[in-house]
Regions:
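A short hydrophobic beta-strand segment most commonly corresponding to one strand
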Residues: 47, 107-124
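Short, conserved beta-strand element in jelly-roll/cupin
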Residues: 47-51, 61-76, 114-117
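Short, surface-exposed secondary-structure boundary micro-motifs
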Residues: 96-97, 116
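Conserved short histidine dyad/triad with adjacent acidic residue
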Residues: 30-31, 46-61, 95
Length: 126
């Protein structure tokens, strides 16, 4: 047993977290799985779903994003390159780097996205 002082452990059941539409892109939804309101001191973990035919416009974020693809096959544009991603792929999108998403397939795409807690300024590009 440890004498370390820190946050209490949390187990968040996926079906207990409601997904909400994301205003910036039709067909994109987000569920916040863990963040500072749950006692997570450093990072927020979110689950995104990208519906078939959905596109997220080019944008930048003030904070880095680490992503892990759960389902589907879709395109992620990062900088000047496009990448087709599928389950098991992991991505690092550094702060300030332009990126976008496009799901041209028939199945939803889903990914986990981890970001630092705190404010994130999002700027649409173009």
């Amino acid at each position: 047993m440890s004498d370390a002082v820190g946050p209490d452990p949390v187990v968040q059941r996926g079906d207990a977290v409601a997904a909400e539409p994301v205003d910036a892109a039709e067909g994109l939804s987000k569920a916040v799985l863990l963040d500072e309101s749950d006692g997570a001191p450093n990072f927020a973990m979110r689950r995104f779903e990208l519906a078939p035919g959905a596109e997220v416009p080019r944008h930048t974020n003030a904070v880095e994003h680490e992503q892990y693809v759960l389902a589907g096959e879709y395109v992620v544009g990062i900088g000047d390159e496009e990448h087709v991603v599928s389950p098991g792929d992991a991505l690092l999108i550094p702060a300030g780097v332009e990126h976008w998403y496009r799901n041209a397939g028939d199945e939803p795409g889903a990914f986990i996205c981890v970001v630092p807690n705190g404010d994130d300024a999002i700027e649409l590009v173009g």
